[in-house]
Amino acid sequence: MKNRKALALIAVLALVIAACGGSDGGSDDAVEEVVETTEAPAEEAPTTTAAPEPAGDPLVLASLMPLSGDLAALGPGIALGAALAVQQINAAGGINGVPVELIEGDSGCDGAIALDSLTEAIAGGAQGVMGAACSGTSLAILDTAIAAEVVMVSPSNTSPQFTKMDKKGFYARTAPSDLLQGDVLASLLLEDGVESISIISRADAYGRGLAEATASALSLIHI
């Protein structure tokens, strides 16, 4: 039963994350053209049924994005996208008729900041978390989320460590592992005829993971 609930929450979180980006590309001209077309006929316009208002106890989700720190330029936009997605989901009737509430929290790119925000979100009834953005930050708070049976879905964690961990069904990510990035980088260097290389990386979980994956892939092709 717990696994079914976790899978359902992962699906909902992935839906919200996916809804954070993209647009329909429509224009005001297109809207005006449709309005003119519908006003011209004398026939009765078809009736439309509005989506029912979501009711019942809300599904509480939390957004843990870097609103401070090194990635503060990226976090607010992602958080706003998540808030818009939740607004659109509720306007369409919620999730199976249940409204969605969103708690916005700051993860920084710092485990301590993220843990404080996660603790507050759990106290506020959060059942699922979007985030964190940084691999090291998610690694620092994942055990707490698992212990509370709160699902985490990250849009950007790439550390290979997550693949090997026992996540007990409470973690997923929508970004590929650095192992894949390492293979691609090695292939590009081979195509460019590079024979030797030095690797400089960030001193965090993301940087170390990508550097190790790239070095491993390079060793297989003798660079």
Labelled PLM ranges:
Residues M1-L7:
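Bacterial N-terminal signal peptides that target proteins for export
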Residues I17-A19:
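C-terminal motif of bacterial Sec signal peptides marking the signal peptidase cleavage site
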Residues G21-V31:
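Bacterial lipoprotein signal-peptidase II cleavage site
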Residues A30-P52:
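Extracellular mucin-like PTS domains
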Residues A45-S63, G94-P99, L189-E195:
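Immediate post-signal peptide segment of exported/extracytoplasmic ligand-binding proteins
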Residues P52-A55, L59-A83, G105-A112, A133-G136, ...:
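Extracytoplasmic "Venus flytrap"
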Residues L80-L102, L220:
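Signal peptide-proximal N-terminal region
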Residues A112, D116, A126-L220:
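Extracytoplasmic ligand/sensor domains, especially the bilobed periplasmic-binding protein
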